[in-house]
Amino acid sequence: KEKKITPNKTSAKPEVTIANGRIQMNSTLLVGSSHTTPWWNGKLKTNFLKKASPAITRFVPGREGLGLTDRMDSVIGYMIQKNILVFDQNYGLWYDRRRDDHERVRRRDGDVWGPFYEQPFGRSGQGTAWEGLSKYDLNRPNAWYWSRLKEFAEKGNKDGLLLFHENYFQHNILEAGAHWVDCPWRSTNNINQTGFPEPAPFAGDKRIFVADMFYDITHPVRRELHRQYIR
């Protein structure tokens, strides 16, 4: 008689709670430091890669490793070795490393430089954004970005590691004007009619302060985009 094989039941996911201000997993206190992801800068030269740190949504086509497209198991190993408990995730300050020059000019072409700091939104294939690629569609999630976060969260969870995802990035909407010019939410960079003034309202021809407009949920289009994004 053929032996019947019963598949193993998947174990329940660890339960993470906050009790008396302390983060616990399955009632056990979690202890360790945090790692804030790089969100700008970077070079592809070998001597620079030695000094790089993990960034799970950094992308370099065809190349893997620290400072490039990080291997997720290597990121987890890095955190365990250095007693890091939390990976604090931000999307990139900008996608194209040419903007590291902090200029506010429109790029004349889409000859972008890596490493690329991925954004949570996908491209529309329509029009031309400030950095020379197609405009974003804020209703279209960047599947690669979110799949990378999901992969880290699932694999890291097995080793008691946590992912803190920052839904928003104040650096884009305050301070240096270059932080705003390539932002997916800027009206000229998307197909969603976000309603931010164009040309960009630089203060003193340099700084940007659009936080009040950005978080103004009385604007019907932006309110719905925020709702879809954070749900």
Model region roles, listed by residue range:
Residues 17-231:
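Active-site mouth of glycoside hydrolases
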